Amino acid sequence: DYKTMPLDDAFKIKKEDYFTKNGGIIFPNPNAPTGELMSVEDIDEIISHNPDSVVVIDEAYIDFGGKTVLPLLKKYDNLLVIHTFSKFRSLAGSRLGVALGNEELISHLYDVKNSFNSYPIDALAQVIGEASIQDSDVIKEHAKKIVATRERTKKSLKEMGFTMTDSYSNFIFVHHDDFDAEYIFKELRKKHIIVRYFNAPRINQYLRVTIGNDEEMDAFLDAVKEIIQAS
């Protein structure tokens, strides 16, 4: 059994929700689809309240401006940090990821893995993964460009009246008080621009916009401006 914990009114994780007895904790940081980031200090406090539980932090989007909790691995044996090669390294097709934690904790993960999935990572994925690590400086520069484009896009959308969460990811989560999110989504689709619309409580007036290159984001911003001005 598991229990999901609601975010607060600002779509942030409430650290106090994780101070009670539990069988384990897992959450993404930065979060999805909001992009909100919890501080290392707050995560440290959560772990300190849970000495008998494994705390798993999914840092899939951490390289787009966030501060990693990896230094806390020296402090806590019950912390597990997971990274993917799908986002920052743009290798979704390789199905590569890493789990970092205490040696004993990792050995237990191997026991579980081998009980239902004994398939190793294929040779091609290993070569690709190793090459991407060796090319980390180039990939970091690419991530910096994404962050710069993200901030420029946020600024332009704010000038059009949009509000948004404080995203530390390669996407932004936006809302407009005067325009229905589903309407904007459908109008953008007519222009062959796809964003993510969530028909779900609390977030059905938000759109998640993935950050592309400057040319793609300029086309997106121009399209949004046309939709707003025509309404």
Give a label for each model feature.
Residues 3-8, 83, 198-199:
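Short beta->alpha connector loops at strand-helix junctions that form conserved
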Residues 41, 187-191, 196, 200-231:
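PLP-dependent enzyme catalytic core of the Aspartate aminotransferase-like
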Residues 78-158, 162-165:
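PLP-dependent aminotransferase class I/II
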Residues 12, 93, 168, 202-205:
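Short acidic/glycine-enriched loop/turn segments that link adjacent beta-strands
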Residues 7-63:
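Active-site phosphate-binding strand-loop segment of PLP-dependent enzymes
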